[in-house]
Amino acid sequence: MVREGEERIGNRVLLGVIGVSYRETTLQQREQVLHILQQAQGSFRPEVFQEERDYVLLATCHRVELYSVAPAELFDSLAQEIKLLGVSPYFYRNQDCFAHLFCVAGGLDSLVLGETEIQGQVKRAYLQAAREQKLSFALHFLFQKALKEGKVFRAKGGAPYAAITIPILVDQELRRRQIDKKASLLFIGYSEINRSVAYHLRRQGFSCITFCSRQQLPTLSMRQVVREELCFQDPYRVVFLGSLELQYALPHSLWESIWDIPDRIVFDFAVPRALPSHTVFPHRYMDMDQISDWLREHRKEVNSAHLDSLREVAYRYWNSLNQRLERHDCVGANA
């Protein structure tokens, strides 16, 4: 159902996205922007909708974005606050917002060109927002169509094959450090990035893999330990941190012991980082900044024809949305 006031999109109220990505920012800056956007969510209250909130927050390893139907002044205010960090955020409105999310969902705006993980991340961000709020029709329409067309784009072979990925980087790093394939590996968090790395390493012959999550996962074929039973004194040779807000999920006393095993390696995939930078041993630790640098060196350039193809699809959906809103406006005027 189209909500009253949505016919104003493109005038005083905009459908827009503001954010930063790996292109403009370091990991630390993305963490700071994430904090700003989290604090600002309560400000996205377009009076014309008479709703408390109307936004979708997309936070991944390489991007932090907030999508909303809101007055332009709110986007401007956020942009000014982010600029105080020394960062220039991008802001796309209306049809350009459509084009941006379609390219994001299709893997064409990713550091790992053509990656599939972003599709799931976009879907989870949308579903979480839909559970917590009464989203506007425009946001439902935007995310549903972007997810649909991202999937279609991949199925047709439009998305390039991601030959250089985070699992491949991890595999190469373990080989460089001569980590034995019988070594014990611990994955904290059942995130998609942790799963992709774990299954890749198992295919490469690593056999002692343990997952730690909030609760037992009945379908998981690997060893498991619940968080309450986690102990860093156990001889885990490599630890992978891949859960959101992980820094606060475990007691401080437990984190203090993560370096007690000599030569233990830690991969921190979390954003914000699970381990503050001043607490780590640099030669035994990799965060998303270091991983991003490696990926950037090996990144393929996006095919402009692929970009144009997805953008054209996005523009058609934007026009379709406007036609629906105009029809609703006409019906309301004649009622």
UniProtKB/Swiss-Prot annotation:
GO molecular function: glutamyl-tRNA reductase activity; NADP binding
UniProt-listed InterPro entries: 4pyrrol_synth_GluRdtase (IPR000343), 4pyrrol_synth_GluRdtase_N (IPR015895), GluRdtase_CS (IPR018214), GluRdtase_N_sf (IPR036343)
Keyword NADP: yes
EC nos: 1.2.1.70
Keyword terms, alphabetized: NADP, Oxidoreductase, Porphyrin biosynthesis
Additional record remark: During catalysis, the active site Cys acts as a nucleophile attacking the alpha-carbonyl group of tRNA-bound glutamate with the formation of a thioester intermediate between enzyme and glutamate, and the concomitant release of tRNA(Glu). The thioester intermediate is finally reduced by direct hydride transfer from NADPH, to form the product GSA.
Subunit structure: Homodimer.
Family membership noted in the UniProt record: Belongs to the glutamyl-tRNA reductase family.
This protein's domain notes: Possesses an unusual extended V-shaped dimeric structure with each monomer consisting of three distinct domains arranged along a curved 'spinal' alpha-helix. The N-terminal catalytic domain specifically recognizes the glutamate moiety of the substrate. The second domain is the NADPH-binding domain, and the third C-terminal domain is responsible for dimerization.
Designated name of the protein: Glutamyl-tRNA reductase
Species this chain originates from: Chlamydia trachomatis serovar L2 (strain ATCC VR-902B / DSM 19102 / 434/Bu)
